[in-house]
Amino acid sequence: MASALRPPRVPKPKGVLPSHYYESFLEKKGPCDRDYKKFWAGLQGLTIYFYNSNRDFQHVEKLNLGAFEKLTDEIPWGSSRDPGTHFSLILRDQEIKFKVETLECREMWKGFILTVVELRVPTDLTLLPGHLYMMSEVLAKEEARRALETPSCFLKVSRLEAQLLLERYPECGNLLLRPSGDGADGVSVTTRQMHNGTHVVRHYKVKREGPKYVIDVEQPFSCTSLDAVVNYFVSHTKKALVPFLLDEDYEKVLGYVEADKENGENVWVAPSAPGPGPAPCTGGPKPLSPASSQDKLPPLPPLPNQEENYVTPIGDGPAVDYENQDVASSSWPVILKPKKLPKPPAKLPKPPVGPKPEPKVFNGGLGRKLPVSSAQPLFPTAGLADMTAELQKKLEKRRALEH
């Protein structure tokens, strides 16, 4: 018998390695780290991505350069001279230290970071002409990317909301872009600065004229993108104005590192989110919370003129409105009045008495059994017939009193 044909094995699709402006091995030490940790790092846009290896597709950390302040060369602790392999990246709220293998690698990292942050090729670094050409190409790519990208300090808020954001989060910046209030295809710039102990809030108008943005000041200035508008305000105020950037250093997708069984490499795995459970039934009874020791007391009656939805306990019957009826005591059994009772028989038949259980025979004898045709529903005791007759007499007396 021929074995069943199996479909051909499809090779597992491999992800595409991310592209970066510049990438190399980089050792990083954050404010809370005790020692340096080695990563494969890549610069793309205004973000540095960190990977466990140069063959990983998913980053494990990232660092936003939106709050960039400056770069400085770092001399290792206990060393009398600069080995040319340490530098520090100072942001608005933290300082990160880096360590590379060579002086050339350090200058390359500093040059590419300054290129994307300041949108210019630095000229005060120890770089070769080929390095400067690479940075000029990155500058053109970054300018094209920002022309199509909305700055991070642009928020869809009103004028009042912009003022409140700058007031509530002063550590996040003091310059914010927002849609124009006149409904035109332009933007407005809101700033908040301290002057003589008083916070001063100012608003600037930016008009849209074709593909360009014109800043409406004494000498109108034309910009090719919104990012250029932000750079104009930052550069013309000697960096006194800082773009507003809320802290968003938290990931939205859960992931973990797992070793690939085929090649042994570490890969980043993002498990699929579990689907939502069944929706609770709105029309059904509400679940009862576990009762405490104080809930064992009988519930109090509801207050008048209050509309509350609550669940009636099982042991409590609904209130009954009685109209021209005798209310029976709770200690006596309540007999419901039927609409029409049949005439009682002249004499109640005596209920048959059930047979006694047959004695067990241990010596092999057989006990006698009743015929099957004589099996009838039996009363448990003979006293139940007397109680039925007594209730019947009471019912006849009540009917006589009513008539």
UniProtKB/Swiss-Prot annotation:
Residue ranges with Pro residues bias: 343-356
Major localisation: cytoplasm
GO cellular component entries: cytosol; plasma membrane
Outcome reported for the amino acid change (mutating Y250F): Loss of tyrosine phosphorylation
UniProt region (Disordered), positions on chain: 270-308, 331-374
Keyword Cytoplasm assigned: yes
Assembly with partners or alone: Interacts with PTK6 and CSF1R.
Free-text function comment from the UniProt entry: Substrate of protein kinase PTK6. May play a regulatory role in the acute-phase response in systemic inflammation and may modulate STAT3 activity.
Entry-linked PANTHER family: SIGNAL-TRANSDUCING ADAPTOR PROTEIN 2 (PTHR16186:SF11), SIGNAL-TRANSDUCING ADAPTOR PROTEIN-RELATED (PTHR16186)
Name used for this protein in its record: Signal-transducing adaptor protein 2
Gene responsible for this protein: STAP2
